[in-house]
Amino acid sequence: MLISEGELKLVPYHEISNGQTRDGTQAFHDQEYSYLKSVDSSGDKNSPFYLNSTYIPEQQMPSELNIEQRDASGHVVSLLADEDILEGEAFAQGMGLSSSDFSIQKVGGEFRFLCKGRGHGLGFSQYGGNQLAREGKNWKEILETYFPAMEVAAYEE
């Protein structure tokens, strides 16, 4: 089990990070998730699925689309769509993007979204954890890498 302050907590996972996992307080905008720390997961950059492009026809998009704010790990926190401020994670999910760490480029009559990683980037990276295992780390060392503010404890009834 993974515990923080003597309690079981949410321990999210994702497929591939952008090279660094996200901080829980930045992603959720809530101190309740302060136990989710941003950690290096640069092995994820070796994944063949690290970069993903999605093309969306210009007619399906607002005329103006600009990234307003990113968090410390590079994920889009907010973007301006014409006159509206949109939340980055919700936008990425709604548009079918692989990650909220994306850049926007207008290419011909389309918008190109270049995404780094797959998933929300919080907690455990499946690809990164596998990389650490291949390097000889055991399960406990891997969990301690991705959840440094949490304690690995045995289950007791």
Question: Where in this protein do the model-derived segments appear?
Answer:
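Conserved, single-site charged/polar hotspot
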Residues: 1-157
